[in-house]
């Protein structure tokens, strides 16, 4: 039987990423054959990964990477926040973003077949990471953005990498693009423009807003405050030419009833129309980047600010770790109970 030296164990660990005991056991089982030991660890790693496949991984990090005129933002998940801070995990996330930006896959299936800097496929890298780290590690999603030579990327990560953003702007510079990405990280828009919102979604969100107004009015009534008006519309998409024309006529009728001289109406109407637009595009303001008040200049929307500096938002992608993942509150408790039960039965 071959002698299993510390040097041999170290070499196997460096090649496989396995722990000391796992590496030593693999060498013992394969009589010191390095290639067979690596293959054995790979098979055991796949088995470990398979056992962890149905676990919920809702922690993790985002990664962003710019490669020429392409940029990628990715989300990689782990089961615990502790592992998400692990150096091996962070390297995996960064390598994944780089691989996506340079490989330009069309979907997750293509992405999983790309070759990582380590020389293995992305899919294999995650199997091995799950085996060596000891938690389910999963590649969840990516977004790949492209720009022209004249456009600019804004790459930004917030909260230790839990939020990752890439934006594309035309005009301006990289610094402005990064500021736009910082706004996106903070304000959570889901689309660029109101034209991308689903009509039924707008109706549903408008109903929620009016329900909140109804609840607020109940509280206001208790302290003899005047009720707030309900919203008629929620998006610019609902404001047809007829709707806007009627709003202007209503304002004129209001001014006439107040006895305001017609000669000053032209000075009053634009401000009231701006207010009408603001009050009736609340859904746009919540979900569309261009309609949101710009955090760097709260006197303007993002669209108005960019227009004032001869720039334009083209596209963006924003990922926040765990969004949309339903994590059971008793995952940890269940795992501990199962471990104790197994120990008692052995």
UniProtKB/Swiss-Prot annotation:
Residues 80-83 are annotated as: Involved in Mg(2+) ion dislocation from EF-Tu. Its main location: cytoplasm. Keywords: Cytoplasm, Elongation factor, Protein biosynthesis. Pfam families: EF_TS. GO terms for cellular component: cytoplasm. One of its GO terms (molecular function) is translation elongation factor activity. Disulfide bonds: none annotated. InterPro entries: EF-Ts_dimer_sf (IPR036402), Transl_elong_EFTs/EF1B (IPR001816), Transl_elong_EFTs/EF1B_dimer (IPR014039), Transl_elong_Ts_CS (IPR018101), UBA-like_sf (IPR009060). It is found in: Cytoplasm. PROSITE patterns: EF_TS_1 (PS01126), EF_TS_2 (PS01127). It comes from the Bacteria. SUPFAM superfamilies: Elongation factor Ts (EF-Ts), dimerisation domain (SSF54713), UBA-like (SSF46934). Associates with the EF-Tu.GDP complex and induces the exchange of GDP to GTP. It remains bound to the aminoacyl-tRNA.EF-Tu.GTP complex up to the GTP hydrolysis stage on the ribosome. PANTHER family: ELONGATION FACTOR TS, ELONGATION FACTOR TS, MITOCHONDRIAL. HAMAP family: EF_Ts. Belongs to the EF-Ts family. This is Elongation factor Ts. It comes from Streptococcus uberis (strain ATCC BAA-854 / 0140J).
């Amino acid at each position: 039987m071959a002698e299993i030296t510390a040097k041999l164990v170290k070499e196997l660990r460096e090649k496989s990423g396995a722990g000391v005991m796992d590496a030593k056991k693999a060498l013992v089982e394969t009589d010191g054959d390095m290639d067979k030991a690596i293959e054995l660890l790979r098979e055991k790693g796949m088995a470990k990964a398979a056992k962890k496949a149905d676990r919920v991984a809702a922690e993790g990090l985002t990664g962003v990477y710019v490669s020429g005129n392409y940029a990628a933002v990715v989300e990689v998940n782990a089961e615990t926040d502790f592992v998400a801070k692990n150096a091996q995990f962070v390297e995996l996330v960064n390598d994944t973003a780089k691989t996506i930006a340079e490989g330009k896959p069309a979907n997750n299936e293509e992405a999983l077949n790309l070759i990582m800097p380590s020389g293995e496929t992305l899919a294999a890298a995650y199997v091995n990471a799950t085996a060596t780290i000891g938690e389910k590690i999963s590649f969840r999603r990516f977004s790949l953005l492209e720009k022209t030579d004249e456009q600019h990327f804004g790459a930004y990560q917030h909260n230790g990498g839990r939020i990752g953003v890439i934006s594309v702007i035309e005009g301006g510079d990289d610094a402005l693009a990064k500021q736009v990405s910082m706004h996106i990280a903070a304000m959570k828009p889901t689309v660029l423009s109101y034209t991308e919102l689903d009509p039924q979604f707008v109706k549903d969100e408008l109903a929620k807003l009016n329900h909140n107004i109804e609840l607020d009015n109940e509280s206001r009534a208790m302290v003899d405050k005047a009720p707030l008006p309900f919203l008629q519309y929620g998006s610019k998409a609902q404001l047809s030419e007829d709707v806007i024309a009627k709003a202007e006529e209503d304002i004129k009728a209001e001014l006439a009833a107040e006895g305001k001289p017609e000669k000053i109406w032209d000075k009053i109407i634009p401000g009231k129309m701006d207010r009408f637009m603001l009050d009736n595009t609340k859904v746009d303001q919540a979900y569309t980047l261009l309609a949101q008040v710009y955090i760097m200049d709260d006197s303007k929307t993002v669209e108005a600010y960019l227009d004032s500096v001869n720039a334009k938002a083209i596209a963006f992608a924003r990922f926040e770790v765990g969004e949309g993942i339903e994590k059971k509150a008793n995952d940890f408790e269940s795992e501990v109970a199962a471990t104790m039960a197994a120990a008692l039965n052995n």
